[in-house]
């Protein structure tokens, strides 16, 4: 049945991952397999619908586990698997909620640089305000130090400024 539903409307694939992220449930393995096998059909879905689901997914409390590499390769072909893997912990470290979408988009798409994030978000038909805010965050984050890649987070790399929207992170 999932195959049939995903074939009827491929956006249901992204909705599946969004709801799983929002409510924290595990996706049934056959359903996940069907979603991955049919994710190429997402090419037929309007970018506005994809952007809306992606924004809601990224606004969930801890979306990283639900950022599926194969599905995102269709939705965000600009993002390499290595960049996605590096971005996942940073995305989860960012504050949740729709109001923090620019921060999470900047964390997810940091590897694209300022121009790349602008092109990608414009392709997804994001608002000009969202594009500008995310691009500025990427520019500022990349200027924090020379090791702007996530994996080198010694507490002083850009992961911290991006994750906390250039605010001082809470003490643990």
Where are these regions (language model features)?
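Divalent-cation-assisted or electrostatically stabilized phosphate/pyrophosphate-binding catalytic cores
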Residues: 1, 5, 43, 49
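Hydrophobic alpha-helical scaffolding
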Residues: 6, 25, 40-44, 56-60, ...
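A residue-level signal for conserved active-site and pocket-lining positions in enzyme catalytic cores
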Residues: 9, 14-17, 66-70, 138
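Amphipathic alpha-helical segments within well-ordered protein domains
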Residues: 17-20, 36, 55, 118-125, ...
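Hydrophobic alpha-helical interaction segments
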Residues: 31-38, 53-54, 63-73
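C-terminal subdomains that position terminal phosphate/3'-OH groups for nucleotidyl transfer/ligation
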Residues: 69, 81-172
């Amino acid at each position: 049945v999932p195959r049939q539903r995903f074939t009827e409307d491929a956006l249901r694939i992204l909705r599946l991952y969004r709801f799983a992220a929002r409510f924290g449930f595990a996706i049934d393995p056959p359903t996940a397999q069907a979603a991955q096998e049919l994710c190429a059909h997402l090419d037929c879905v309007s970018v506005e619908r994809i952007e809306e689901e992606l924004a809601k997914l990224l606004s969930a409390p801890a979306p990283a586990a639900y950022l599926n590499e194969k599905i995102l390769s269709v939705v965000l072909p600009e993002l390499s698997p290595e960049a996605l893997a590096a971005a996942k912990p940073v995305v989860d470290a960012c504050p949740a909620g729709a109001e923090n979408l620019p921060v999470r988009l900047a964390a997810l798409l940091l590897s694209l640089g300022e121009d790349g994030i602008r092109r990608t978000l414009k392709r997804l038909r994001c608002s000009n305000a969202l594009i500008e805010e995310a691009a500025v965050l990427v520019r500022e984050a990349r200027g924090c130090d020379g090791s702007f890649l996530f994996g080198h987070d010694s507490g002083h790399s850009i992961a911290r400024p991006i994750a906390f929207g250039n605010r001082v992170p809470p003490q643990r």
